Amino acid sequence: MIRFSWVRLCSSAMAAAAASPDVQAITRAQAMQLDDLSPRKIASILDSYIVGQAEGKRAVAISLRNRWRRRQIEDEGLRRDILPKNILLVGPTGVGKTEISRRMAKLTEAPFVKVEATKYTEVGFKGKDVESIIEDLYSNAKTKAKRRLEIEREKEAHELALEIVFNGWHSCRSASGSFGSSTRNSGSGDSSAEEDKNSSSRDNVTFEEFKEKYKTQFKDDMVVIDVTQQPKGNTKPNASINSVEMLSVGILLGLGSESRGVKTRVTKRVEEALPLATQEALSRLVDETQISALARTLAEQDGVVFIDEIDKVVTEPASANADVSSTGVQQDLLPLIEGSNVTLKDGSQISTDNILFICSGAFHTVKTSDMIAELQGRLPVRVEMHALKEEDIRRILCEPKFNLLLQQKALMKTENIDLEFTPDAVDELARVTTKVNANAQNIGARRLHTVVERVMDEYSFNCQDYEGKKVVIDAEVVRKATGSLMNNIDLAKYIL
């Protein structure tokens, strides 16, 4: 498959600040991740973690691949006009809506945030502003950008850290040597001569020799190094100030920016000092400008925003209980989803044109057609997620790469307990989960956690009684552990 020009991906980062070779290398690697990921392959990877919901996987796989296709287009004007097709996932809770989106973002290490629509209010009402969604996305992108830049400069930072530790080690040796010479004058001639010989041999150690032996011969030697310590306490602007303008003015005046760290001299052993020196070296090699430039590129070009419970801010048009604030949230989401420039607290701007928005909701009491028409038009891809059946629950227990039963086996292994689930136990777990969901509130696959924990309660608490033994969980054990749940009429009192 043809590799695309990675320069287009990092163009926005270079527009914000001169992109360093590190930023360019990372954006190139980020862009090339999608080269060999066809929609079919993306769906296949998602199959390893999520059972069923083929239509949902298909939709996000196409959206992810469309990002790659857009970057192949040479005509810049045409490429600018091709926008992501935002997605609306409709289905009950616990069927995999969030997990599909999260795994899709994780597949390409894209910045990802999950928010609930009910947490936001219309501008002018008490509550969070929808533009804070982009602030959260940018914060997530900065974390990823910082980590990637540090990985890119890891070898260089390690070399610099060794130099810092070596200089501290050498200074410490020199100081102890000058102190020792004055005290040894009154001591035994033979012993002082031997000490002088050892001291002299260490004083003559070169940096290359130190690099070879710092893990063995010199690891317990003491060194003195300077490290940067961040001041304790809240260094952010007053939380009650929500105005972007006030924050920007504060930053310009030096009131709202993050406080710089204070240099502190510490004495450590060589093996303890090296991690501190490495972090110190990384802080020199990776500056805030590089992090911000890369974070902006990642957020704008690869960001994914998952808005859950979108149906909770939708009311029937003729309803007497229509909430004007909830309708206003839909209105406020329009420019965000359509594409606009959002001003962040630090005064910089993030374009939402190419951010992928995935909205989801159960839509039990309202219909998707009850959303305001403009919002419907900005969510052109709609996917119906089906409720989980007993067979789906059974597959969820066994098929995902890191399924619940595998997790329980690994946890018990740490207690030297060999745990085994028989096939009829898996069937019984699926049956109980399905029945409880049918008789109580249906929370989908999340119910499995409650049922499995009820079964494992005895072995988790009394683990010392089963140490060194093999524990076999069959259908009878499951029935005994969950019998009180199944025999109760009002299951809601006992289940989440």
From Swiss-Prot:
Subcellular location per the Swiss-Prot or TrEMBL entry: Mitochondrion matrix, Kinetoplast
Binding-site positions, ATP: V51, G94, V95, G96, K97, T98, E99, D308, E374, R446
Primary localization: mitochondrion
Keywords: ATP-binding, Chaperone, Kinetoplast, Mitochondrion, Nucleotide-binding, Transit peptide
Gene Ontology BP terms: mitochondrial DNA replication; proteolysis involved in protein catabolic process
GO cellular component, one term: kinetoplast
Domain of life: Eukaryota
Region (Disordered): 177-204
Feature: compositional bias, Low complexity: 177-191
Any Pfam family hit: AAA_2
Presequence extent in this chain: 1-10
One Gene Ontology MF term: ATP binding
Assembly and interaction partners: A double ring-shaped homohexamer of HslV is capped on each side by a ring-shaped HslU homohexamer. The assembly of the HslU/HslV complex (HslVU) is dependent on binding of ATP.
UniProt family annotation: Belongs to the ClpX chaperone family. HslU subfamily.
Function, as annotated: ATPase subunit of a proteasome-like degradation complex; this subunit has chaperone activity. The binding of ATP and its subsequent hydrolysis by HslU are essential for unfolding of protein substrates subsequently hydrolyzed by HslV. HslU recognizes the N-terminal part of its protein substrates and unfolds these before they are guided to HslV for hydrolysis. The HslVU protease complex functions in mitochondrial DNA replication by regulating DNA helicase PIF2 protein levels.
Protein name in the entry: ATP-dependent protease ATPase subunit HslU2
Organism: Trypanosoma brucei brucei (strain 927/4 GUTat10.1)
Lineage of source species: Eukaryota, Discoba, Euglenozoa, Kinetoplastea, Metakinetoplastina
Encoding gene (name): HslU2
